[in-house]
Amino acid sequence: MALVEEAAAYLDGPGREESRVLPRAAALAYSTESMRLTTRLMQVASWLLLQRAVNEGELTSSEAQAERVRVKFSRDEYGCGSEIFEQLPAMLRNLSQRSVRIQERVMHLDQSLVVAHSREPVKARSEVASQVERLRAAFSP
């Protein structure tokens, strides 16, 4: 979350000033990359909030898996080629690179959780439990 705050402070402050002096192609790349940066960070934050909800017992892992499909991670790292990317302000490049690394880590963790969730045994209803319930129902007042 600190990276989200750092990116917001940069984009609303010094980044805005730096973008005004960029050549046209780099200014367009700046706009694209800043949107990708914020989207990437919001997706990571959403994923982290889901995991926190599971850890705090607010959601089951199955419920989180169902919600997880709303979090869309893009495999595209940057919104422009490396030549234009190098023309962007150093701070934007740094924030973008850090956000991509975090997204890659989250995607790896997410994949690990998906694999672990798919290996969880499905609790089958036993015949004995079913018969006990029928007996209780038959003899209850």
Where are these regions (language model features)?
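Surface-exposed peri-terminal alpha-helical interaction modules
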Residues: 1-141
